[in-house]
Structures are given as structure tokens and as C-alpha cells.
Amino acid sequence: MPEYLSIATHERIEMISIGSQLAELLRKKAEDGWKDGFLAVYSPHTTCGLTINEGWDPDVMADMESFLAARVPQDWGFRHAEGNSDAHIKTSFFGSSVLVPVADGRPDLGQWQAVYLCESDGPRVRTLRVSFLKEA
């Protein structure tokens, strides 16, 4: 049975670490005996993606935001004219899902890694679907 996370974003373009929310879901699942496998985290939004990247130095996410803003400006002159065309393109750089390994009830990421929600058309409240996959 999937769980759902609601994440409030506060800026038009924003990278938000969701590790603490995922850890809380894992704590609840561990109480039910689920400790090893994978979390499949999915964003059903076309202007908000997910990525796993550097989690220690916040300048990495700031650089990503600046890079995308420079390469895909909001006023580029898109044919899609709803005003958020750049957000659709930016989201495609990240994708709509990540698979997070879990060991002993905790995310088993690399030393510097973190899971990020990548907002491209905020501020909004985003809903993420989290599925728990047991190892065979």
C-alpha cells in the first residue's frame, strides 16, 4: 500500500530535501517489520521532479537552480503559452521518480547524497507517492 507525502514549496524554483519526511515514513514501516528493500518515490506533477544529488553542500542545489534558470529562461518564447512552459522542460531534466535503497529501516544512500523535490513552478503544495518494495 503506498503512502503519500505533501510537500509545500515556497519559491517558483526550489530544491527541497525530503530526507526527513522519507525517514519518518520508514520509521513507521519499521514498526510493522519492514526494514529492507527500496522506496519508489513518484511525483505525478509535470512541473515538479525528483533527483538524488549532493546533500551536504547547499551550493550544489543553488548552482543547479542557477544553471537551469540560465539555460531554460521563463520568457524564452515557448509555443505552449500557459506561462509555465519552462517548468515542464526543467522537470524533464530530473524525471518524475527516484528509487531509494533501504537497509535496516534507513535510506542507504551514499555519504553525501540526499533526495530532492525539484520545484519548477511554485509555490505549491506537491503530493508524492511513496511505495515500499521488499527485497526478494
Predicted features, each with a name:
Residues 1-136:
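Active-site histidine-anchored catalytic micro-motif
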